[in-house]
Design a protein with these regions (language model features):
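PAPS-dependent sulfotransferases, especially Golgi type II membrane carbohydrate sulfotransferases
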Residues: 185-195, 199, 208-273, 333-338, ...
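Phosphate-binding active sites in nucleotide-utilizing proteins
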Residues: 275-386, 394
Length: 533
């Protein structure tokens, strides 16, 4: 039996692993012209602005080339230039007419550029025209499941598997839907079959092992849960390559940057932007699995606030543009100090425009909340750009955080590579939160720490506290945040959990795995003590 290549549920169809590469002529789409190949090469080495110029040049030179329109739209969307991306896709849609293959590619592109409703429309049109594109069933099912339309998603997956019985990624998603539909026996049977299927892509196997681990955890079979999760992590460890070493190099530099800063730097930066229009914004950060998603969803239910959920815009695009030059490949205190006010003004506006584009609505007079746990390590840069920002820091028992980070599957990246062993996860937690503890003694910006344990025990009290900190009046409707989630897609990996009623069973979860966590406890002790756990 032959399996399709794993696509991490369609998230990997990006310019880093383009769908449209290989031969120079792509039937039905056009020529993969040299400009596009060079642009992809630049993109892969993070030379994004140069890549965008080449993508757009290709569209200008070859206006009928559908490959150029698709690649350019995805590149622009990835850089939050969404209006320009939509213009490209409008042209693609005119060319598509009744071609399901083009409509499918357009649907993928709309999904990538934060336009899920347009993506849904495209995939529906595909399925009305043909049953020969199983991917379209899976794409649409995933979009529905994110909106908790589980029954409709399941019907689509059944259709998908009738069209492509050997589509193992669809089998994996079917098993997840069965779990959500409370058919644990059928779900586990599928997960186990996939985990041990040597024809399945290793990442499909890894995800199946993670689901098996979660089932054992729910059944309080903690040793079995850990064994299953170790099988998942073993597969990922074999694929990490040099990712961890590269991440460690950057992290070491960021630690040094935080250590070099003084209160005087932050005071000086606040004074430097006094002439610029003040923005009403806040950052919600800390560390993954610390309760940021729950707090964000509660606050986002307030009429005076709008949140952006884990956008990459600042860390990937804005922050490097602040300081990066051929002579400054990594941020330094001197480089941050030397940023001219004109550049700060332009980048502040660029950040705001990116967020509004992804939200697909103006922020207006509302508070903008940038929820992003990994932002902790680049907070100096954010506060250089926006000294007026308020900081909400989510706290949770460090031991529970580390167990929670380890006990899930995440696609490999510079953050998740730390979650492949418990000891690494503990080291990364201590790294990030030690940086926060240093920063809170130096920064001039207001900050507030909110404990997950307090939030799940008394949501109203902590919601009132956070809203008051943000300068917003109390609105009882925020306590009904779950009603909004029934039709709202959440980007965080915890989108399913946050839609459930509040529960306290995750408090002290680490005790179930104490034997395995033991080597990491001394690493976490400074944070345990500092945060009062």
């Amino acid at each position: 039996m032959t399996s399709r290549a794993n696509k991490d549920f369609r998230r990997a169809a990006t310019l880093r692993a383009p769908v449209l590469k290989g031969t120079n002529v792509i039937p039905g789409l056009g020529v993969d012209v040299p400009e596009l190949r060079r642009a992809r090469g630049l993109w892969q080495v993070n030379r994004f602005d140069e890549a965008l110029e080449l993508f757009e040049k290709a569209v200008q030179l070859y206006p009928q080339n559908l490959v150029a329109l698709i690649d350019a739209s995805r590149a622009l969307g990835a850089r939050f230039e969404i209006a320009r991306a939509e213009a490209m896709l409008d042209r693609l849609m005119k060319a598509a007419r009744q071609r399901p293959d083009i409509l499918h590619l357009a649907g993928q592109s709309y999904r990538m550029i934060f336009r899920p409703d347009r993506a849904i429309e495209c995939f529906r049109r595909v399925l009305a025209l043909t049953m020969e594109l199983p991917d379209a069933y899976l794409e649409l099912a995933i979009l529905y499941e994110r909106r908790h339309r589980v029954g409709e998603a399941f019907a689509l997956i059944e259709d998908c598997l009738r069209a492509a019985p050997d589509y193992l990624e669809a089998e994996l998603f079917k098993a997840r839907l069965l779990r959500r539909m409370k058919d644990d026996v059928a779900a586990e049977s599928l997960f186990r079959a996939l985990a041990t299927n040597t024809q399945a892509h290793p990442l499909v196997q890894a995800q199946a092992w993670a689901e098996i681990a979660q089932r054992h955890d729910r059944d309080e079979e903690y040793e079995k849960a850990m064994r299953a999760m170790l099988n998942c992590k073993k597969i990922l460890l074999e694929r990490e390559g040099v990712m961890r070493q590269q991440a460690e190099k950057v992290m070491g530099h960021l630690r040094g940057l935080v250590g070099s800063l003084t209160p005087a730097h932050f005071e000086r930066w606040a004074q430097a932007t006094e002439t610029l229009p003040c923005k009403s914004l806040a950052v919600l950060t800390s560390f993954p699995r610390s309760g940021t998603t729950l707090l964000e969803q509660v606050l986002d239910a307030h009429t005076g606030l709008v949140s952006s959920d884990e956008r990459e815009a600042f860390a990937r695009d804005i922050f490097p543009a602040m300081w990066m030059t051929p002579a400054t490949p990594l941020p330094t205190v001197q480089a941050l100090d030397a940023i001219p006010v004109q550049r700060l003004a332009a980048l502040r506006q660029r950040y705001w425009a990116y967020m509004e584009a992804a939200l697909n609505e103006p922020i207006g007079t509302r508070v903008h909340l940038d929820k992003n746990p990994p932002l902790t390590v680049v907070l100096p840069g954010f506060l250089r750009l926006f000294p007026e920002a308020r900081l909400l820091i989510a706290l949770r028992d460090p031991r529970d955080v580390v167990i929670s980070c380890f006990m899930q599957y995440l696609p490999l990246n510079s953050n998740s590579v730390y979650f492949l062993t418990l000891e690494r996860a503990a080291q990364r937690y201590e790294n990030d939160m030690a940086m926060w503890r240093k920063l809170r003694e130096k920064i001039a910006s207001p900050w507030l720490e909110v404990r997950y344990e307090d939030t799940v025990r008394n949501l109203e009290e902590q919601a009132r506290r956070a809203l008051a900190f943000l300068g917003l009046p109390w609105e009882p409707s925020v306590l009904g945040y779950r009603e909004r989630l029934s039709q709202k897609a959440v980007a965080s990996p915890t989108y399913e959990a946050v839609s459930q009623p509040l529960y306290t069973r995750a408090i002290g979860r680490w005790k179930n795995y104490q034997e395995f966590l033991e080597p990491g406890l001394p690493i976490l002790q400074p944070s345990i003590d500092a945060f009062g756990y």
